[in-house]
């Protein structure tokens, strides 16, 4: 199965998947630095991204970036949420929740194959971002934090929104995108860098905001 196949078979509410199908993905996220919590982002063979919710910490120890993973879909739940495929267990009757730790190994099977992260990253401009890149690894070059952000840290308790801080980066043409940092991130208290450079991360969406 592909992500496109799964999205066609899924709706806006969580539904149980009953077929004995397997979805293959390559991990593009890591919770090692504390900025991702109980989620894994992957891409299928076509490069389409999707997300799996797992009720476990330190998922990077088993499902590190570049690791090929086989997802046995039978009896899991799927949903299209904010324009992207979500896979997990059932929560609150209609939503995707986290797969219980005790059965994660039954559904997520590690391959011996690990590919270089460079083969998975999409090097794009901020103006290129769209739902097609959701839950994929993206990289922007020649970007910087907005002038009014400089002097602060990645995370600020005075700008806390749901346990994280949104900062804005801008490119040479004035296009902007949000960089979201959790209070639990290893770099939460690091000062924002000055000057231009590269930034790499996983694209997600919350309501109308891509971040």
Language-model features, listed with the residues they occupy:
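OB-fold nucleic-acid-binding modules
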Residues: 1-211
């Amino acid at each position: 199965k592909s992500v496109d196949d799964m999205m066609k078979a899924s709706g806006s509410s969580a539904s149980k998947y009953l077929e004995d199908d397997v979805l293959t993905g390559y991990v593009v996220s890591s919770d090692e630095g504390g900025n991702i919590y109980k989620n894994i982002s992957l891409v299928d063979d076509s490069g389409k991204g999707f997300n799996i919710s797992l009720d476990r910490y330190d998922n990077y120890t088993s499902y590190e970036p570049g690791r090929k993973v086989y997802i046995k879909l039978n009896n899991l739940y799927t949903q299209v949420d904010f324009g992207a495929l979500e896979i997990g267990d059932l929560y609150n009757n209609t939503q995707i929740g986290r797969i219980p730790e005790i059965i994660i190994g039954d559904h997520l099977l590690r391959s011996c194959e690990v590919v270089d992260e460079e083969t998975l990253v999409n090097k794009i401009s901020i103006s290129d971002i769209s739902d097609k890149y959701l839950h994929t690894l993206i990289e922007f070059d020649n970007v910087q934090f907005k002038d009014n952000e400089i002097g602060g840290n990645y995370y600020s308790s005075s700008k806390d929104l749901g346990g994280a801080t949104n900062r804005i980066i801008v490119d040479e043409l004035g296009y902007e995108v949000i960089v979201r940092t959790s209070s639990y991130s290893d770099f939460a208290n690091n000062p924002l860098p000055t000057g231009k450079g590269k930034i790499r991360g996983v694209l997600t969406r919350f309501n109308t905001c891509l971040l």
